[in-house]
A protein has these predicted regions:
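Catalytic helix-loop patch of NAD(P)-dependent Rossmann-fold dehydrogenases
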Residues: 141-185
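NAD(P)-dependent short-chain dehydrogenase/reductase
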Residues: 172-228
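C-terminal amphipathic/interface module of NAD(P)-dependent oxidoreductases
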Residues: 2-11, 15-16, 71, 272-275, ...
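N-terminal Rossmann NAD(P)H-binding glycine-rich loop of SDR-like oxidoreductase domains
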Residues: 20-41
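Mid/C-terminal beta-alpha module of Rossmann-like enzyme folds, strongest
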Residues: 227, 235-296, 332-333, 341-353
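Conserved Rossmann-fold NAD(P)-dependent oxidoreductase catalytic core, especially the SDR/UDP-sugar
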Residues: 109, 113-158
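Glycine-rich NAD(P)-binding loop of the Rossmann-fold in SDR/ketoreductase-type enzymes
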Residues: 102-113, 160-161, 231
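NAD(P)H-binding glycine-rich loop region in Rossmannoid oxidoreductase-like domains
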Residues: 57, 63, 68-109, 117
Length: 353
């Protein structure tokens, strides 16, 4: 859907020098809000056109907002992208997990519309939000670089869709060599303001935020394969900004130290960890998912236990990127937001207890 006109309530960047014009899809989500904020604060950026299905009251400097949906048959993306220096594509739908054809329509077909519109409008740079989830199952005892296969975990919709888009971009880059394509592959992204949204996406009503307290979590399960990487969303946004302003191309892994495992989680909750096979945990999750008590599917659980650990050396070197916060600090901030029901003034990030 498109609004009849763009909301230009934010003041343009002052000064006579012409800076970059950027379009951000999915501008109101966890990553989108951090990326838009980072762009709005950078002197190299003159204006940011923010696309979202629902226009928020949140208005950073230099931003113009447009209600737009990337799905087939919806917004005229070529018109919206015309005259732009770069498109950062972040729009993504996590639910409904019981109807993967619906998420496929938005995430895959919608992304393909974005890619095609970038080429048709003559936009020189496309920055796409890929993910660690695009990677094929990999090692947990060493890190892999961006050359690791990106076939995803085929049973989970999220990883299947992220991997499929990697293949789409492989073909796209051959067909459109004039477009500089950058693929960002972050680990799990957390910030205080995303806590309510992420609880709704992954845990639903089964996990009220007020229950995530140390006194109520005496132990953390130590599952085989439970080793993952995380980073603060604002640190990921800094990498997106660098990808726009630096003449780089290709894929970039993004992760902060340390690797998160059961011992790290146990320390966060001041609890003990205990070894348990994955099968009973998966069975309980599958039952809760079938009963629609939790939105996250057991297939996504399987995928998480198979994700490789990533080497972020390329991002640190070519993007001059160095995360400000550790993965533990990002998780601490997220958990604090979860307990307090923190959010932001956008529809996806709306606060909720």
């Amino acid at each position: 859907m498109t609004a009849p006109s763009m909301d230009r309530s934010s003041q343009p960047h002052p000064g006579g020098a012409k800076g970059m014009r950027i379009v951000v899809t999915g501008a109101t989500g966890n990553v989108g809000t951090s990326v838009v904020q980072a762009l709005s604060e950078d002197p190299a950026v003159d204006s940011v056109l923010c696309l979202a299905r629902r226009v928020p009251s949140w208005r950073p400097a230099k931003t113009t907002w447009q209600a737009a949906d990337v799905e087939p048959g919806m917004a005229d993306l070529v018109r919206l992208f015309d005259g732009t220096d770069a498109v950062i594509h972040l729009a993504w739908k996590f639910q409904p997990t019981h109807h993967p054809a619906e998420t496929w329509r938005t995430n895959v077909l919608g992304s393909m519309r974005v890619f095609d519109a970038v080429a048709a409008a003559g936009v020189p740079t496309l920055v796409h939000a890929s993910s660690v989830g695009a990677y094929s199952p990999g090692p947990k005892d060493r890190s892999v670089d961006e050359s690791w296969p990106t076939h995803g975990w085929p049973q989970a919709a999220y990883t299947r869709e992220k991997a499929y888009l990697e293949r789409v971009l492989d073909t796209y880059e051959h067909a459109h060599p004039a477009v500089r394509v950058v693929r960002m592959r972050p680990g799990f992204l957390f910030k205080r303001e995303s806590a309510s949204e992420q609880r709704r996406i992954f845990a639903g009503r089964l996990l009220p935020g007020r229950l995530v307290r140390n006194t109520l979590i005496p132990a953390v399960p130590d599952l085989p394969g439970l080793r993952f990487q995380a980073l603060h969303t604002d640190d990921a946004a800094a990498a997106y900004l660098a990808a726009v302003t630096r003449p780089v191309h290709g894929a970039f892994n993004l992760a902060a130290d340390p690797v998160v495992d059961a011992s790290v989680l146990a320390e966060l909750f001041e609890a003990r960890s205990f070894a348990i096979p994955a099968a009973p945990v998966r069975a309980a999750l599958a039952a809760a998912w079938r009963l629609r008590l939790v939105p996250a599917s057991p297939d996504l659980f399987d995928a998480v236990l198979r994700l490789p650990l990533m080497d972020s050396s390329r991002a640190r070197k070519e993007l001059a990127w160095d995360p400000v916060r550790t993965s533990v600090e990002a998780l601490e901030e997220f958990l604090a937001g979860l307990r307090s029901g923190t959010g932001m003034a956008t529809a996806p990030l709306a606060a909720g207890a």
